[in-house]
């Protein structure tokens, strides 16, 4: 048992050292302005590549991801219903859906779902 822990520790140490050395050796010495500028078919760019991004799009994306993960978690619950205690499954499902509804209400209350503002 001790030899397995020793070998695992040795492998972990070697991997850590290799990753550290790789990160040091792969860093660029200096940043070239031409290489970091946007490329538009050899022409100078018409505008800055760092345009401000609307926070509304970001928030809608986050809300979509949350509810997308919700669907990924709810679908297996339907299959698990056959194999588990119905009371535990019902309680878990109700708590899960209540947490999501409270989150949706909070987003609505904060005005995140109101696109007109």
Curated annotation (Swiss-Prot):
<dbReference type="GO" id="GO:0008137">
    <property type="term" value="F:NADH dehydrogenase (ubiquinone) activity"/>
</dbReference>
<dbReference type="GO" id="GO:0030964">
    <property type="term" value="C:NADH dehydrogenase complex"/>
</dbReference>
<keyword id="KW-0472">Membrane</keyword>
<comment type="function">
    <text>Core subunit of the mitochondrial membrane respiratory chain NADH dehydrogenase (Complex I) that is believed to belong to the minimal assembly required for catalysis. Complex I functions in the transfer of electrons from NADH to the respiratory chain. The immediate electron acceptor for the enzyme is believed to be ubiquinone.</text>
</comment>
<protein>
    <recommendedName>
        <fullName>NADH-ubiquinone oxidoreductase chain 3</fullName>
        <ecNumber>7.1.1.2</ecNumber>
    </recommendedName>
</protein>
<keyword id="KW-0249">Electron transport</keyword>
<feature type="transmembrane region" description="Helical">
    <location>
        <begin position="86"/>
        <end position="106"/>
    </location>
</feature>
<dbReference type="InterPro" id="IPR000440">
    <property type="entry name" value="NADH_UbQ/plastoQ_OxRdtase_su3"/>
</dbReference>
<dbReference type="GO" id="GO:0031966">
    <property type="term" value="C:mitochondrial membrane"/>
</dbReference>
<keyword id="KW-0813">Transport</keyword>
<keyword id="KW-0812">Transmembrane</keyword>
<keyword id="KW-1133">Transmembrane helix</keyword>
<keyword id="KW-0830">Ubiquinone</keyword>
<dbReference type="Pfam" id="PF00507">
    <property type="entry name" value="Oxidored_q4"/>
</dbReference>
<comment type="similarity">
    <text>Belongs to the complex I subunit 3 family.</text>
</comment>
<feature type="transmembrane region" description="Helical">
    <location>
        <begin position="60"/>
        <end position="80"/>
    </location>
</feature>
<keyword id="KW-0679">Respiratory chain</keyword>
<feature type="transmembrane region" description="Helical">
    <location>
        <begin position="4"/>
        <end position="24"/>
    </location>
</feature>
<keyword id="KW-1278">Translocase</keyword>
<keyword id="KW-0520">NAD</keyword>
<keyword id="KW-0496">Mitochondrion</keyword>
<dbReference type="InterPro" id="IPR038430">
    <property type="entry name" value="NDAH_ubi_oxred_su3_sf"/>
</dbReference>
